[in-house]
Amino acid sequence: MPPYTIVYFPVRGRCEAMRILLADQGQSWKEEVVTVETWRKGSLKSTCLYGQLPKFEDGDLTLYQSNAILRHLGRSLGLYGKDQREAALVDMVNDGVEDLRCKYITLIYTKYEEGKDDYVKALPGHLKPFETLLSQNQGGKAFIVGDQISFVDYNLLDLLLIHQVLAPGCLDNFPLLSAYVARLSARPKIKAFLSSPDHVNRPINGNGKQ
């Protein structure tokens, strides 16, 4: 039986980064898909610590909060930098990813039609810090922190992939980020996952907007 279980809605949402991570690390996991109808009944929601999904099970450990789950996997699988300095940088970058993801979620679920143009115009300013970070690490030819992959690489990759759907060409003026996405997406296990029905057929968001 797979050691990990993801309990979530039938979307990529906040779980696709951890799925990409698990796939790339050769880990197996089980999906328990929760429909909106089931969720609205309230019985599952009442058992969730913060009243929200995802819920993640690692053996007898149950976790909520997607970034806590990513950090747990980072520690468990050696994806948290090679020392405390790198771990601090990984945390910093992950907070930056979360900031932009929250902006994206607000756009998708509350003001997509009226807010998309302004969001896309402001997007370069939000992407620039990640380009800068890459430029400061081995000329952008490695990972976002250090010389080995960390959990934040998977989170950033997912964030960039969904923004390429929202705003095709958004990385055209960011050559390091563009190469970074191509490089990570070409890793054999990530490439296989991104081309699999599990990824391709799963909507990005729950309301059909992307």
From Swiss-Prot:
One of its GO terms (cellular component) is nucleus. One of its GO terms (biological process) is prostaglandin metabolic process. The keyword Acetylation applies. Keywords: Acetylation, Cytoplasm, Lipid metabolism, Mitochondrion, Nucleus, Phosphoprotein, Transferase. It is found in: Cytoplasm; Mitochondrion; Nucleus. One of its GO terms (molecular function) is glutathione transferase activity. Pfam families: GST_C_3, GST_N. Its EC number is 2.5.1.18. PROSITE patterns: GST_CTER, GST_NTER. The modification N6-succinyllysine is found at residues 103, 116. The modification Phosphothreonine is found at residue 62. Glutathione binds at residues 8, 14, 39, 45, 52-53, 65-66. Residues 2-81 form the GST N-terminal domain. It catalyses: RX + glutathione = an S-substituted glutathione + a halide anion + H(+); prostaglandin J2 + glutathione = prostaglandin J2-S-(R)-glutathione; prostaglandin J2 + glutathione = prostaglandin J2-S-(S)-glutathione; prostaglandin A2 + glutathione = prostaglandin A2-S-(S)-glutathione. InterPro entries: Glutathione-S-Trfase_C-like (IPR010987), Glutathione-S-Trfase_C_sf (IPR036282), Glutathione_S-Trfase (IPR040079), Glutathione_S-Trfase_N (IPR004045), GST_C (IPR004046), GST_pi (IPR003082), GST_superfamily (IPR050213), Thioredoxin-like_sf (IPR036249). Its main location: cytoplasm. Residues 83-204 form the GST C-terminal domain. The modification N6-acetyllysine is found at residue 128. The modification Phosphotyrosine is found at residue 4. Homodimer. Interacts with CDK5. Belongs to the GST superfamily. Pi family. Conjugation of reduced glutathione to a wide number of exogenous and endogenous hydrophobic electrophiles. Involved in the formation of glutathione conjugates of both prostaglandin A2 (PGA2) and prostaglandin J2 (PGJ2). Participates in the formation of novel hepoxilin regioisomers. Negatively regulates CDK5 activity via p25/p35 translocation to prevent neurodegeneration. This is Glutathione S-transferase P. It comes from Cricetulus longicaudatus (Long-tailed dwarf hamster).
